[in-house]
Amino acid sequence: MVGKRGLILITCQNSDCEYFLVEEGKNITKNGHNPAGNQQYLCHHCGRYFIETKNTPLYHSRLARSEVILIAKHSMEKTSIRGVSRVLDHHRDTISKYFHLIGQHAEMLNNHYIRDISAGNCEFDEIWSFIHKKNKNLLPDDPYEFGDCWTYTGFKRESGLMISFNAGKRVEKTCEIMLNYFFERMELPLPGNKISIFTDGNCQYSNTLQDLYCDSCMDYGQVIKSKEQNRLVRVIRERIFGNPEIKSISTSVVEGYNNKIRQRLSRFTRKTASYSKRMIGYVNSMNIFQFVHNFIDIKLDHQTPAMLERVTDHHWNWSEFLCHHIQL
C-alpha cells in the first residue's frame, strides 16, 4: 500500500519550468538518491529530475559539504584566500571558485529576504579600501576599478540590520546606487511614521535623499566632526530635513559596524597583503558578510538582526545558508 506523500519543502529548480521556484501549485516527488548521496526529486510539471543541491554552491561540488562550510567560515574570519588554501589544503583557485559561488548565493538571498523593512532610525557611512593598488601607485592605463574603493553602507540602528551597500569610487553615483537599494528594501514611510536618517557631513547623501523621500516623511540630520592633528576637537549636529531630535543625530552605530567589517574581512585592513585584486572578489566578500551579519551572527537576546526585524523566525546556520533555495 502506498503511503501518504510527505511534505516537500523544495520547489522546482529547473529554470525552464513554468513552476520554477514557485511554491503554490508545485507537484514534486522524491526520487531516490544520486551516486553522491544527494536527494533526487522529480517535477511532474516539466518531467525533469533535479537534486537538492541544484542552484546552490554545493551543486556538482567535488568537496564534501563540511569542507565548503569551512571555506565559507574562514572567509569571514580575517583569513585570506591563500590562508584558507593553506589551512584546508586545497588549491587557491578552488578556494576562489567556491568563494565566488558563495558570494553569488548570498547576494541572491539578500535580495530576496531583505524586503519591506519597517521605517525607523537608519545610519549611513562609508568605509575605505582599495582594489589591486592604492591611488598613489596608479598608472595612466590602469583599469578604472583599480585604486581607492569606497563602500557605502546603510544600517538600521535598533536592530543592527545591514540593509544595503554599494562599492565604487567616492562619487555621487556610488552613493545614489546604495540609496536606491536602500529605498527598494524599505517600507514607504508616512507623515505619521517617518523614517529618520543620519549621516556624516557628506553632501552626496542629501542630494539623493531629496529625490527619494518627501520632506514630510523624513527626518534627516548630519553629524559633522572636526579634527586637528588627527584628534577630535568638535562635533556639530545639524538638522537638514524635517525635525529630528538633536541628541539622536549620530553615526556611532554604523561606524561600529564598519569597524566590524574591518575586523572580520582581511581585505579591509589598512596595511595588508590580503587586499582585493578584483572588484568581483571585493563585492562577493561584502555579500557574504551582509548575509552572515544579518542571519547568522547573534546580536542580543539570542536573536540575529533579521530575527529582530522579523525577516526570519529562526537563527540560521551555515549549512542552511549554503543549501537554501528561495521560493516565490
Where does each model-flagged region fall?
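Residue-level recognition of single "structural anchor" positions
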Residues: 1-328
